[in-house]
Swiss-Prot record:
GO biological process: protein modification process; proteolysis
Keyword Protein biosynthesis: no
WD repeat residue intervals: 139-175, 179-213, 217-255, 259-306, 313-352, 364-403, 410-452
Residue(s) carrying N6-acetyllysine: K298
F-box domain residues: 54-101
PANTHER family: F-BOX/WD REPEAT-CONTAINING PROTEIN 2, F-BOX_WD REPEAT-CONTAINING PROTEIN 2
Protein name stated in the entry: F-box/WD repeat-containing protein 2
GO annotations of cellular component type: cytosol
Length: 454
């Protein structure tokens, strides 16, 4: 049949077909199908799927498909990837969807990386790590053995852990190998801090000392406190060392000369923590880049100027109860923007720019949680039995890890958090190394470490 004649015939039969009842149309189709060969049946099969099952991801413009995908949760998206190769291709190409999914899990996102497949892989890795945290399978434990008396001073930095003991020694350990890098003879250690060249110790003998790792020699001795020195901090740029003591004072020393520059008074309890830190916000009293001195006792946190004036005045005192009915837990977090401390009422977070309380995070199901680390996304907490991870966005505990019966000092010197960058968001690389360390009754050090990804 010629093309023109065929078109005329097709128009006529179409008019007739449209005039039929539904039953007659069905009978007509059945008859035509019975007369069809393999080519016609294949054609019918291919076109029926498009007519009866509208594949919107295939038919819509890519921008509209991406917009619709943003309304689905990640688990549904992964299921949708199994529908067809086309769906998997479209869903796997939506960068924003997978970046958002990673952010919602507390992952750090580099917006400059726009490779959607990369972020999908990151999400799959992230969901595995979060499942391990939920199932108590993300960590493993180890021990450091070498001291012969109680260990009451710990400090961690860049994969190295320093331990100070009543056996008149301090040791520096490589956490990854468990090997002792340095061991030197000291006085009794109540507090320690170190860098590559030196170790600074606060002692129960009321003094502070500076030691050289390579030779073990004492290079400086700071005398002046009349009580045990419970906390030390120093800054080489300022050439300043600060110490907090059981004599209720904070002393500021010349690090290189060993002379006392100032004695800060005002505390009425043991000073258990001193912190030297750069300010990162502008306030009425400070500018970004200014160095700040914080000191804490059982009830109060005091903020001081860094100066050499005699009778230096405290700039601000923070507390959680005016009548001193609520104690602060050991461990103080200050990152230049926020001050965070735990108490029986919960975690208190102060804005350093205004000194206002930003929020109080309560954990009614678990009382008296002590603070170990605080970040943008997560907080690391613990009590006598467990180590906890809190998602600060929801203020819910997302993981816990059992702890042995460890030696918990009231000053908070015998336990600490390890690597802290993951508290600002995991990134697939920073969940390695030390999570937590504490001294044990048998004088060993108990370590909790990230387990490698399965």
């Amino acid at each position: 049949m010629e093309r023109k004649d065929f078109e005329t015939w097709l128009d006529n039969i179409s008019v007739t077909f449209l005039s039929l009842t539904d039953l007659q149309k069905n009978e007509t189709l059945d008859h035509l199908i019975s007369l069809s060969g393999a080519v016609q049946l294949r054609h019918l099969s291919n076109n029926l799927e498009t007519l009866l099952k509208r594949d919107f991801l295939k038919l819509l413009p890519l921008e509209l498909s991406f917009y619709l995908l943003k309304w689905l949760d990640p688990q549904t998206l992964l299921t949708c990837c199994l529908v067809s190769k086309q769906w998997n291709k479209v869903i796997s190409a939506c960068t924003e969807v997978w970046q958002t999914a990673c952010k919602n899990l507390g992952w750090q996102i580099d917006d400059s990386v726009q490779d959607a497949l990369h972020w999908k892989k990151v999400y799959l890795k992230a969901i595995l790590r979060m499942k391990q945290l939920e199932d108590h399978e993300a960590f493993e434990t180890s021990s450091l053995i070498g001291h012969s008396a109680r260990v009451y001073a710990l400090y961690y930095k860049d994969g190295l852990l320093c331990t100070g003991s009543d056996d008149l020694s301090a040791k520096l350990w490589d956490v990854s190998t468990g090997q002792c890098v340095y061991g030197i003879q000291t006085h009794t250690c109540a507090a320690v801090k170190f860098d590559e060249q030196k170790l600074v110790t606060g002692s129960f003998d009321n003094t502070v000392a500076c030691w050289e790792w390579s030779s073990g020699a004492r290079t400086q001795h700071f005398r002046g406190h009349t009580g045990a020195v419970f906390s030390v901090d120093y800054n080489d740029e300022l050439d300043i060392l600060v110490s907090g003591s059981a004599d209720f004072t904070v002393k500021v020393w010349a690090l290189s000369a060993g002379t006392c520059l100032n004695t800060l008074t005002g505390h009425t309890e043991w000073v258990t923590k001193v912190v030297l830190q750069k300010c990162k916000v502008k306030s009425l009293l400070h500018s970004p880049g200014d160095y700040i001195l914080l000191s804490a006792d059982k009830y109060e946190i005091k903020i001081w100027p860094i100066g050499r004036e005699i009778n230096c005045k405290c700039l601000k005192t923070l507390s959680v109860s005016e009548d001193r009915s609520i104690c602060l837990q050991p461990r103080l977090h200050f990152d230049g923007k926020y001050i965070v401390c735990s108490s029986a009422l919960g975690l208190y977070q102060w804005d350093f720019a205004s000194y206002d309380i930003l929020r109080v995070i309560k954990t009614p199901e678990i009382a008296n949680l002590a603070l170990l680390g605080f970040g943008d996304i997560f907080a690391l907490l613990f009590d006598n039995r467990y180590l906890y991870i809190m998602d600060l966005r929801t203020e819910s505990l997302i993981s816990r890890w059992p702890l042995p019966e460890y030696r918990k000092s009231k000053r908070g010197s015998s336990f600490l958090a390890g690597e802290a960058s993951w508290l600002n968001g995991l990134d697939g690389h920073n969940d390695t190394g030390l999570v937590f360390a504490t001294s044990m009754p048998d004088h060993s050090i108990h370590l909790v470490l990230w387990k490698e990804h399965g």
